[in-house]
Amino acid sequence: LTVRFRQRLKERLLGNLMVDLEMPLVPVLVSMELAGIGIDGDFFAEMRSKLIRELELIREDIFKLAGGDFNLNSTPQLRQVLFENLNLPIIKKTKTGPSTDGSVLEELAAKGHAVPRLMIDYRELEKLRSTYVDALPQLVHEETGRIHTSFNQTVAATGRLSSSDPNLQNIPIRTEIGREIRKGFVSQAGSV
C-alpha cells in the first residue's frame, strides 16, 4: 500500500512536498495538540457575567419597544412582533411566513428600525456567550488544565491546516467583544 501511494505522489509531482513539508509537520502538530492551550477561568466567568448583563439590557429594550415580552429565540414570536405588532415591511418570505434571518434584520435596521438592530446585537452576543464564553471553560482537560484541539493536516483541499474539537482557529476577532474573548487565552508561566 505504501509503495502505491508513493508512486501516486511521484506521478503527481507531490513526493517532495510530502517528504519535505507534510511529514516533518506531523510531530510538530502532535506536540501542539498534546501541549494544548491554557485559558483564564476567572476571565471567562467575568466575561460571562458581563455578557449576561448586556443581554438583559438589550432584552429589556426590545420588550419596551415591542410593547411586551416574548421569546427572543422564537422565530414565530419575533415574526409576530416585527410584522404584525410593529407593522414593519416584509423583506422576504419563507415557507412558514416572513423571514427574520440576519439579512432581513440588517435591511430593516438600515431603514432605522430599532428592534431589528437590537435583535442583531442580541443574537451576536448570545452566540459569543454560548459558543465561546460558556463552552470553552467546559472543554478544559481535567488532568492538564488546558484545552486540547485537533489540528487537521489533510481536511482542507487548499492544504491549509484546520482545527476541530474545538475549532480554536475560529475565535472571533471582528467585533470588540470577539477580540476581548481572545484575551482569555493564556500562556504557561515563563513561556512568553
For each of these PLM feature ranges, what is it?
Residues L1-G178, S187-S191:
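Conserved "right-hand" nucleotidyltransferase catalytic core of DNA-directed polymerases
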